[in-house]
A protein has these predicted regions:
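Glycine- and small/polar-enriched repetitive beta-structure motifs of secreted/surface proteins
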Residues: 1-262
Length: 262
């Protein structure tokens, strides 16, 4: 019953309130089968693609472009998604950008795993970027730590980052290898921090930097700097190390407080 809506496609903008006063949202655009089909009072949302924004009830200022993008987001606002199944499982996240196929796919879920459904202020760009971000295996993770204020850019970048905020991850398969929790870290470069499981407040810049380093407070700059000498779990757990230069400190395992330059 709202005004200034444009709906094109079977069940597009159908409305989730099936009795009076029906669905009163306005200024919405939905194009595609079941796009924005459940809306009630939401407004200023654009959903283009098969089941795009399908579950949105009263969110606003969202843009969903791509088949099933933002499909489960019921009450979130200020989200931008572009790509097949981008932001697919999120139910209430807001002010998030997901660009690329399956970017930020698992923001929430069900089954034997405990998932966080309120993930905010994330930018994920790339194929499968941040795919598992926000899905937290029960019992073994800091449940109170939200996946907020993260930036992940690149093919499979941050794909296995489950929890923790204020991270910057840029590069093909950076921070992607084992389920991980990290906070306040920067990983830039191909496979940088690829197997980090729990380290926080690290800086790793350069291809393969900190690839097998799971400790905290490390700084690695340069090709393969601080890669880590233990290449299988539990990997290299040394902390508070600084390595600058080509393959500097590349073989460290449990070292603490080392500085290697050159």
């Amino acid at each position: 019953t709202g005004s200034y809506n444009t709906f094109v496609g079977t069940s597009a903008g159908k409305g989730g309130t099936t009795s009076a006063p029906f669905s009163s949202g306005g200024n919405n655009t939905a194009v595609g089968y079941q796009a924005l089909t459940a809306f009630t009072v939401g407004d200023h949302t654009t959903a283009i693609g098969y089941q795009a924004g399908k579950a949105q009830v009263d969110g606003y200022d969202n843009t969903y472009i791509g088949a099933r993008s933002g499909q489960a987001n019921a009450v979130g606002d200020g989200n931008v998604t572009l790509g097949d199944r981008a932001l697919y499982s999120d139910t209430s996240g807001h002010r998030t950008i997901a660009i690329g196929k399956d970017a930020l796919h698992f923001f929430s879920g069900s089954g034997t795993t405990d998932f966080q459904s309120d993930i905010t202020k994330i930018i994920a760009i790339g194929y499968f970027a941040g795919y598992n971000m926000g899905s937290v295996p029960g019992g073994s993770w800091p449940q109170a730590t939200r996946s907020t204020n993260n930036i992940v850019i690149g093919y499979y970048a941050g794909n296995t980052h489950y929890a923790g905020g204020s991270n910057v991850v840029i590069g093909t398969e950076a921070l992607n290898g084992v389920p991980n929790y990290t906070q306040g870290s920067v990983y830039i470069g191909e496979s940088s921090g690829q197997n980090v499981s729990s380290g926080s407040y690290n800086v790793a810049i350069g291809a393969y930097t900190g690839r097998y380093a799971t400790g905290s407070y490390n700084t690695f700059v340069g090709y393969k700097a601080g890669t880590g000498g233990t290449t299988s779990a539990p990997f290299s757990s040394g902390t508070s190390n600084t390595a600058v230069g080509y393959e500097a400190l590349t073989g460290f395992t449990t070292g603490y407080g080392n500085t290697a330059v050159g």
